């Protein structure tokens, strides 16, 4: 069955992180470029997969990659916070709602994404699994722009502070595995294994 495309909300793939804990052969590695399934990179896998669900997918990053895709470039070169990408996305895309997802969460199901995109009366709707909140797997409304401006001006980069002070709500999902974050090589190897066994998009 073909997924009905979400055409009224763009998806921004957050890929401006540091990969500081991702070590292969004692070298810090950019996890965005690790191969996944039949794709040359995690970046390509996530971008291609999300295009099956969203009409518009844009990659938020500090520099563009070889992958032919639309990019939103974060200007802050030495500061790493997803708030820059979120803020920049609203300023650039000029759209009421944006769905954000980090590059390193390749197992989130389309059902979960659709559930998050289906709730429209909050500033932020984010995913919550049995053990933690996933603030970056979330639907944001442009009404958060003032709070984003203020957070960046005061250099309070804690996402949880901003979200708790906004009119936000969590959607509870019961599958922890789906929200696996590829912070380390071990996480990556686990995701490769899970994708071999199942079919996540």
UniProtKB/Swiss-Prot annotation:
The UniProt record lists the keyword S-adenosyl-L-methionine: no
EC code: 2.7.7.77
GO biological process: bis(molybdopterin guanine dinucleotide)molybdenum biosynthetic process
Cellular location(s): Cytoplasm
Residues binding Mg(2+): 104
Residues given in the record as GTP binding sites: 14-16, 31, 104
EC top class, as a word: transferase
Entry-linked InterPro entries: MobA-like_NTP_Trfase, Molybde_CF_guanTrfase, Nucleotide-diphossugar_trans
CDD domains: MobA
GO molecular function: GTP binding; metal ion binding; molybdenum cofactor guanylyltransferase activity
Domain of life of the organism encoding this protein: Bacteria
A Pfam short name: NTP_transf_3
One GO cellular component, as annotated: cytoplasm
This protein's UniProt keywords: Cytoplasm, GTP-binding, Magnesium, Metal-binding, Molybdenum cofactor biosynthesis, Nucleotide-binding, Transferase
Keyword Nucleotide-binding part of the UniProt annotation: yes
Gene3D superfamilies referenced in this protein's UniProt entry, alphabetically: Spore Coat Polysaccharide Biosynthesis Protein SpsA, Chain A (3.90.550.10)
Cofactor: Mg(2+)
Record function comment: Transfers a GMP moiety from GTP to Mo-molybdopterin (Mo-MPT) cofactor (Moco or molybdenum cofactor) to form Mo-molybdopterin guanine dinucleotide (Mo-MGD) cofactor.
Family per similarity comment: Belongs to the MobA family.
Subunit (UniProt): Monomer.
Domain notes: The N-terminal domain determines nucleotide recognition and specific binding, while the C-terminal domain determines the specific binding to the target protein.
Family annotation (NCBIfam families): PRK00560.1
UniProt-recorded name of the protein: Molybdenum cofactor guanylyltransferase
Organism of derivation: Helicobacter pylori (strain G27)
Gene: mobA
């Amino acid at each position: 069955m073909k997924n009905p495309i979400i055409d009224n909300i763009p998806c921004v793939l957050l890929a401006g992180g540091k990969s500081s804990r991702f070590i292969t052969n004692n070298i810090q590695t950019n996890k965005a470029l690790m191969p996944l399934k039949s794709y040359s990179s995690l970046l390509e896998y996530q971008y291609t997969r999300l295009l099956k669900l969203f009409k518009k997918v844009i990659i938020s990053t500090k520099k563009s990659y070889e992958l032919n895709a639309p990019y939103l470039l974060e200007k802050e070169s030495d500061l790493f916070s997803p708030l820059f990408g979120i803020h920049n996305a609203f300023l650039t895309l000029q759209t009421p709602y944006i769905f954000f997802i980090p590059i390193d969460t390749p197992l989130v199901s389309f059902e979960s994404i659709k559930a998050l995109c289906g709730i429209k009366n909050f500033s932020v709707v984010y995913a919550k699994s049995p053990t933690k909140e996933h603030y970056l797997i979330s639907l944001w409304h442009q009404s958060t722009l003032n709070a984003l401006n203020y957070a960046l001006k005061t250099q309070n980069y804690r996402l949880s502070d901003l979200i708790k002070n906004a009119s936000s709500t969590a959607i509870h999902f019961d599958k922890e595995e789906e929200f696996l974050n590829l912070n380390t090589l071990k996480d990556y190897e686990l995701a490769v294994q899970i994708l071999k066994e199942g079919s996540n998009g």
